[in-house]
Amino acid sequence: MEYQNTDHTFAVCAYKESPYLESCIKSLVNQKVKSNIIVCTSTPCEVIENMAKKYDIPYYVREGKSDICDDWNFSVACTKTNYVTVAHQDDVYNEHYVEELLKHIPDEKMSIFIADYLPLKGGKAGKRDI
């Protein structure tokens, strides 16, 4: 079976007025291979709602106390695809992320896809801090 970009969703978990949210969303919108994107929050505010509207992204609000475990599970439950990347509001993805992910989905041994990272400091990629 060949997997398509429509088999995957980025579920962005957003909290309050994050200054990084738009950078995260732009990195998802600018993927070379397009994918579904949703924004989820347990701390609704105009900043998050307006950002979702600006990029025409479905927006979901979880009721109850903000809790990262429950929030991430909620974001996965809001998707309609078999493959989900939970993206935190301060994550920025390489433009080839979805392209590379789709290459590895057919591997039956793969149950989780982990990508490398570089921390951004002052808008520039820095050295790994762990």
Language-model regions, residue ranges each:
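N-proximal low-complexity "stem/linker" segments adjacent to membrane-targeting elements
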Residues: 1-27
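Short, acidic, metal-binding catalytic loop of nucleotide-sugar glycosyltransferases
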Residues: 26-35
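A conserved acidic beta->alpha catalytic loop
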Residues: 40-49
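Glycine-rich, basic loop-to-helix element that forms the pyrophosphate-binding segment
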Residues: 63-79
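Short aromatic/hydrophobic "clamp" motif used to bind/position activated sugar donors
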Residues: 84
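The conserved acidic donor/metal-binding loop of glycosyltransferases
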Residues: 88-92
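Conserved donor NDP-sugar-binding/catalytic core segment of glycosyltransferases
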Residues: 98-129
